[in-house]
From Swiss-Prot:
One of its GO terms (biological process) is triterpenoid biosynthetic process. This is Putative pentacyclic triterpene synthase 7. It comes from Arabidopsis thaliana (Mouse-ear cress). InterPro entries: SQ_cyclase_C, SQ_cyclase_N, Squalene_cyclase, Terpene_synthase_CS, Terpenoid_cyclase/PrenylTrfase. One of its GO terms (cellular component) is lipid droplet. CDD domains: SQCY_1 (cd02892). It comes from the Eukaryota. Keywords: Isomerase, Repeat. Belongs to the terpene cyclase/mutase family. Disulfide bonds: none annotated.
Length: 761
């Protein structure tokens, strides 16, 4: 039976390195002696329920670790469940009971080190690159045991679409990129390509691929994966020249101006491209060359395949200017830089520079890297340099941290959302006003936050290595990963400020004030001239450079950008900080808030909403925007943008009283309701909070009461809320799964609601 192990308890490895004793580390292990018949029955029931309801909800409820923790803590829900009838008025006691039920349920799910574990996946291009890399390096069996394979072979077939393909994520239409990758993954996992043609995942996927022209229509990322495996040719890829890393800082585009995730991925890809690395052919690789194309492999004209992309994958169309640019880069890169004397003078120097960057960034992130996609290419680059090198072995030791097991099987995560989920849950707990009931949980959560703050900048001369400051920030996953994120920093700092204001006899140990100042310095530093806040680094690149992006299935992938969600969170925390520490950088903070408010206002859409870059979508961003504006002192009565936001939400409230937004809003950049105007508890919680923040309870409380009824009646017997549609997104077109959002935003909304009802008593 699968068990989730936390932190140092997850085992040790001589090639692992850590900055904080593996705080937040999550490892799944299979223990043959760890289950009773009753526990096994419970797990199998969860798997059957997911399979039976797959047509309705595509994402797992992330139940396996939850069931494990609830068993280990002998959790029993003692607070009665509340049900509100149609004509019934909600009382404060009923709302508070629902809130407390949910809080006590989540308290039982806290890990020993203070964080809340959770899946952070959903993308269908995470699993296959790991399998391909481990197959190439000969370590597939080392990492993926028979039990791992069993779970992966549960996951990939059950997630496929009805047409036989796989989408970019578990809810999206089929794409060439993910269908090709998952087909290869199944074949490496020894699934027969032709067995039972009507039902076989491989047979149907292969038909889907061939019917649409074959694997030459895979986007660039997919082509790179196929090239290193040896089932595609590098000459059929857009160029990824390592010479890019030699560009001086005064160039309009250089290693320091690009988006950190693009940088992390492409530094490793450029090394592999510059070396023209290709795996040693195996019988399977030779078979795949025959299976992935409608014509023979020898007949493919690779130069013609370079710009191909299936219509199903083409979200960001490549213009004539882009095609001309990349054709010119290819000619210069391959016809000049790859020939004597430039190959020795420039290309080999560029490859060494790319490798230097890879090693630096690996060490700075404890070999976690920036996530599931760059991790694979970094690991493969280190193996290509030296199969027995310590660099590669350190990478291999970190692979287990990317694996997640749920009732739908095994999937690879981005790199975890431990800090993000934990800080949002702590804010909910603190807002519930039941501190005495959950004191030990709050203390553990606060301890996790304190220990997770980044207290140093990246090592060495980090500017030369294209890194920015990190001191004072908090990351998305854990301290070891080391990338500070501005929204995680804002929310974490606000949590710490709340704890700072508590009596000393309630919180055993408080944060050093200087570390609070460090966090403020980080937030002030990251603000752009336009008043907005980026996520990881300053948004310093010229926006026109996005026109040259080679990425076909996502948008805004070249540069760091400002986001309304990050900006709103920063306004909230800096407003609170200024009240608690009125003498620290007050004028700068006031200027920051004024500029941020103007930025938020400038991004409001014609319908009164804001576009969400990190969640689905307009409701998500409207919550963070209005929260920031209200913190800055703006009101419904005095500020038109808040009135327009409220009107937007009231207009789209459904007949049931809830809200539910389709993920199609993200790529379409226009609000679209869920099919059938269904309700989603996450969106309902977000919209409900906006209404309460704006004073809707004083104007007309009925829309809020209707929404509260939806949330209260949605709560399950044990205090959980139902898992519905995916609510995370990035780069406009790819969904991410945050299963804890169903608890966070439902309960957070109920904290607002109970306080509003209490004022009426």
């Amino acid at each position: 039976m699968w068990k989730l192990r936390i932190g140092a308890k997850a085992g040790d490895d001589p090639h692992l390195c850590t900055t904080n004793n593996y705080l937040g580390r999550q490892i799944w292990e299979f223990d043959t002696n760890a289950c009773s018949p009753e526990e096994l029955f419970e797990v199998e029931k969860a798997r059957r329920n997911f399979s039976d309801n797959r047509s309705q909800y595509k994402a797992s409820a992330d139940l396996l670790w939850r069931m494990q923790f609830l068993r280990e803590k002998k959790f029993k829900q003692n607070i009665p469940r509340v049900k509100i009838e149609d004509a019934e008025k909600i009382t404060y006691e009923e709302a508070n009971m629902t809130l407390r039920r949910g809080i006590h349920y989540m308290a039982a799910l806290q890990s020993d080190d203070g964080h809340w574990p959770a899946e952070n996946s959903g993308c269908m291009f995470f699993n296959a690159p790991f399998v391909i890399c481990l197959y190439i390096t000969g370590h597939l069996d080392t990492i993926f045991s028979q039990e791992h394979r069993k779970e992966m072979l549960r996951y990939i077939p059950i997630i496929k679409n009805d047409d036989g393909g796989w989408g970019l994520d578990v809810e999206s239409h089929s794409s060439m990129f993910c269908t090709v990758l998952n087909y290869i993954c199944l074949r490496i996992m020894e699934v027969d390509p032709d067995h039972d043609r009507k039902k076989s995942a491989c047979a149907r996927a292969r038909k889907w691929i061939i019917d649409r022209g074959g694997a030459t229509y895979t986007p660039l990322f997919g082509k790179a994966c196929l090239s290193v495996l040896g089932v595609y040719e590098w000459s059929g890829c857009k160029p990824i020249p390592p010479e890019f890393w030699l560009f001086p800082s005064y160039f309009p585009i250089n290693g320091g101006t690009v988006w950190i995730y693009f940088r992390d991925t492409f530094m490793a890809l450029s090394y592999l491209y510059g070396k023209k690395f290709v795996a040693t052919p195996t019988p399977l690789i030779l078979q795949l060359r025959q299976e992935l194309y409608p014509q023979t492999y020898a007949d493919i004209v690779w130069s013609q395949a370079r710009n191909r992309c299936a219509k199903e994958d083409l979200y960001y169309p490549q213009t004539f200017v882009q095609d001309l640019f990349w054709k010119s880069v290819h000619m210069f890169s391959e016809n000049i830089l790859n020939r004597w004397p430039f190959k020795k003078l420039i290309r080999e120097r560029a490859i060494r520079r790319a490798l230097e960057l890879i090693h630096y960034h690996d060490e700075a992130t404890q070999y976690i890297t920036g996530g599931g996609v760059p991790k694979v290419f970094h690991m493969l680059a280190c193996w290509a340099e030296g199969p027995e090198s310590g660099y590669f072995k350190k990478h291999l030791a970190r692979v287990s941290g990317f694996i997640w097991i749920s009732e739908d099987g095994l999937k690879i995560q981005s790199f975890g959302s431990q800090i993000w989920d934990t800080v949002l849950l702590l804010k909910v707990m603190l807002a519930a006003d039941i501190d005495d009931e959950i004191r030990s949980m709050l203390i553990k959560g606060y301890s996790f936050l304190r220990k997770s703050q980044l207290i140093e900048n990246p090592p060495g001369y980090y500017i030369k290595m294209f890194r920015d400051i990190s001191k004072g920030g908090w990351g998305f996953s854990d301290k070891d990963q080391g990338w500070p994120a501005s929204d995680c920093t804002s929310e974490s700092l606000e949590c710490c400020l709340i704890f700072e204001s508590m009596p000393s006899n309630f919180i055993d140990e408080k944060m050093d004030v200087e570390r609070l100042y460090d966090a403020v310095n980080m937030l002030l530093y990251l603000q752009s001239e336009n008043g907005g806040k980026a996520v990881w680094e300053r948004a310093s690149g010229k926006k026109w450079l996005e026109w040259l992006s080679p990425i076909e299935f996502m948008e805004e992938t070249i540069l760091e950008h400002e986001y309304v969600e990050c900006t709103g969170s920063a306004v909230v925390v800096l407003t609170r900080f200024m009240k608690q520490f009125p003498r620290h950088r007050t004028k700068e903070i006031e200027t920051f808030i004024a500029k941020a408010v103007k930025y938020i206002e400038s991004l409001q859409m014609a319908d009164g909403s804001w576009y969400g870059n990190w969640g689905v979508c307009f409701i998500y961003a409207t919550f963070f925007a209005v929260r920031g504006l209200v913190a800055a002192g703006k009101t419904y009565q005095s500020y038109e943008p808040i009135r327009r936001a409220v009107q937007f939400l009231l207009k789209i409230q459904n007949d049931e009283g809830g809200w539910g937004e389709s993920f199609l809003s993200c790529p379409g950049k226009k609000y679209i309701s869920l099919e059938g105007n269904k309700t989603n508890v996450v969106n309902t919680g977000q919209a409900m909070m906006v209404l309460i923040m704006s004073g809707q309870m004083e104007r007309d409380p009925l829309p809020v009461h209707r929404a509260a009824k939806v949330l209260i009646n949605s709560q399950m017997e044990n205090g959980d809320f139902p898992q519905q549609e995916l609510r995370g997104v990035y780069k406009m077109n790819v969904l991410l799964h945050y299963p804890t959002y169903r608890n966070i935003f439902s309960l957070w909304a109920l904290t607002y609601y109970t306080k509003a009802l209490r004022l009426l008593l």
